[in-house]
Regions:
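Gly/Ser/Thr/Pro-rich low-complexity, intrinsically disordered segments
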Residues: 3-56, 62-460
């Protein structure tokens, strides 16, 4: 029966005939014997699971079932309320549950294993292929979830997404972010400051800098024709006063702060609150200095950003403050480095750059990432380009019984997937791949909130 957008299937209630548990070389197996087919559902959380089936179990069946701790199974308990039977288990946090059914006789099989990923290769929509598989690096198999998309297809488009259209500051779960922007598929994007929730890297949309690049880090750029470009990106910006004095701008709409000038436009939000103590904020409207505002203690004073202008947050830079009295006319200049990025209206920053022209070029130090970041093993997100120019978005999770990949292992995986160019995105607890309403690579309860992402959109 179809109810709204839901297909509702109703079966006659079944009966549980027996419950069996047996340790295996790869983990644990629980088998439920049924009198006839039954609908069943699985809910997973880190370290536990719940299987609910439409069918009763007699007290004698439940009392005779005494599951002992197994390889990955710590506890197992079954209850029945006369209409449904519920099986709850406590398992190793590294384990996952794979649910399957068998006929003749009717059975439900619950496998608890570290390598529970079911390989898939599905053409999900014209120009969109979903894969999940194990990819081995140095003998270690990593679970890899990927979506390959041909952006040259007229029904597909890619764009940056962030927490709210009215501000670039803030964090939210990727599922919420994707639903808010109505993206069919999404992956978490660039880095951000988890304390103040400000972006730390490039986001450009429709030729407008939502947030500027920092530290010469890697980025992906694209256009409406589906062309993709990867490289390390810097932004050279300066302002020139009416009397010829010139000052560099460090960053645009960014949580990355240092001595000098930070530029904040209306894209940042309605107001700017100083990030550091004792900033002097220069208010500019119609390319003319309107006033100076003392920022005071960081995080306290909200300063309005003119809709026809911007703010210059000066930090330990009295020379610039003195050269910008009210009434001063200002001209701004902007150029990307390399200039190849200039041709692309859409950009998302991340880093480090992993692969360029089929060669692993990973250099965390070049992009000013810490040594600890460069060597740690963690879940990862990445974006790449295949030899035939298709976009590939990828997440890689913990290997069975172990940790996630290092950056070097991630670069190797991207090459094995066929990428000629690839970029690391924010990872760890941020690493999330949203696909048609759910996360492919992890339980949503384990996914951290993020500042931004990449959304793939399908035209109706």
């Amino acid at each position: 029966e179809v109810i709204g957008n839901t297909l509702q299937i109703t079966l006659p209630p079944s009966q549980v005939l027996a419950l069996r548990h047996g340790p295996q070389t790869w983990g644990d197996r629980v088998v439920v014997d049924l009198a006839q087919p039954a609908t069943v559902s699985l809910q997973e959380q880190p370290g536990s699971f719940t299987v609910t089936l439409d069918g009763s179990a007699a007290p004698s069946v439940l009392s005779s079932f005494a599951a002992q701790p197994g390889v990955l199974l710590d506890q197992l308990h079954a209850t029945s309320n006369g209409q449904q039977t519920v099986i709850r288990g406590q398992i190793a946090r590294s384990a996952r549950v794979r649910l399957s059914t068998l006929p003749n006789p009717n059975r439900i099989v619950i496998d608890i294993r570290a390598d529970a990923l079911v390989p898939r290769d599905i053409l999900w929509a014209p120009g969109v292929r979903w894969r999940q598989q194990y990819v081995a690096v140095g003998g270690n198999p990593f679970p890899v979830y990927s979506v390959e998309a041909d952006l040259r297809q007229p029904n597909l488009s890619l764009r940056s997404i962030w927490t709210e259209p009215s501000t670039i500051s803030g964090i939210t779960p990727l599922i919420t972010l994707a639903n808010q922007w109505q993206a069919a598929i999404a992956i978490n994007g660039g880095f951000f400051n988890r304390n103040n929730r400000h972006p730390l890297g490039a986001i450009r949309h429709d030729n407008q800098w939502i947030s500027g690049p920092i530290l010469g880090r890697g980025a992906i750029a694209w256009n409406d024709a589906g062309d993709l470009y990867f490289g390390r990106l810097a932004l050279q910006q300066s302002l020139t006063t009416s009397n010829g004095q010139q000052f560099p701008i460090n960053a645009v709409n960014s949580g990355y702060v240092q001595a000098g000038i930070g530029l904040y436009t209306p894209t940042w939000g309605a107001t700017y609150t100083p990030i550091l103590d004792n900033e002097t904020v220069v208010v500019v409207a119609n390319d003319q200095v309107v006033k100076h505002q003392a920022g005071g203690t960081a995080g306290h004073l909200a300063i309005t950003i003119p809709q026809d202008g911007y703010l210059l947050a000066t930090r330990a830079y009295s020379t610039a403050v003195n050269a910008l009295p009210p009434g001063t006319q200002i001209e701004r200049t902007t150029a990307t480095v390399p200039d190849a990025f200039e041709a692309y209206p859409e950009i998302m920053g991340g880093g480090p750059l992993l692969v360029a022209n089929r060669t692993i070029v990973l250099s965390a130090q070049t992009e000013q990432f810490s040594q600890a970041f460069a060597t740690q093993s963690a879940p990862r997100s990445a974006v790449g380009k295949t030899a035939d120019g298709q976009l590939m978005i990828v997440t890689v999770h913990h290997r069975p019984g172990g940790s996630g990949p290092s950056l070097h292992q991630l670069a190797d995986i991207m090459v094995q997937l066929g990428c000629t160019d690839a970029l690391n995105l924010d990872g760890g607890s941020s690493s999330s791949l949203y696909f048609a309403g759910t996360l492919l690579n992890r339980d949503p309860q384990t996914a951290a909130r993020v500042n931004n992402g990449l959304g793939l959109f399908l035209a109706p």
